[in-house]
Amino acid sequence: MRGLFYLKLLAWVVLLSLCLLMAHRKTKVADKFRALRSRIQSRFNRRIRLNDSFADDLENGLHSRNFDIISENSNDARGGLDDISKNEIKKIMENDNIDFDKARLLYMEKKFGQNGIAPDGTPIDPKAFTFDK
């Protein structure tokens, strides 16, 4: 009788764990389906309307859910990231084996440091004066 109780308890714990895992991975799965949909559309010659720079970035993996370049960029005149930044971010992604968002964050923090800005956006210069709210 006690063994049956523990077996049921174990089954509920496993079921709850699977539900939590699925809820956590839901956004990743949605991103995978979106990428698969765009791949299928491109195979049937249904092009995604992007300007050329964004299309190259998409093919090279320089996008994420937070840096969405798929949605409504056909009339966007901006060129996206410059070539030097793209190459630096790709190197960071390959060397550190991290995703695009983390690589872009590391790149921006490095650029901030080169320009006298702390990673949180405050100036590093000790003579700088900032106003509190």
From Swiss-Prot:
It holds the Pfam family DUF2015. Keywords: Signal. Residues 1-25 form the signal peptide. It comes from the Eukaryota. Belongs to the UPF0357 family. This is UPF0357 protein YCL012C. It comes from Saccharomyces paradoxus. The lineage of its organism: Eukaryota, Fungi, Dikarya, Ascomycota, Saccharomycotina. The gene is YCL012C.
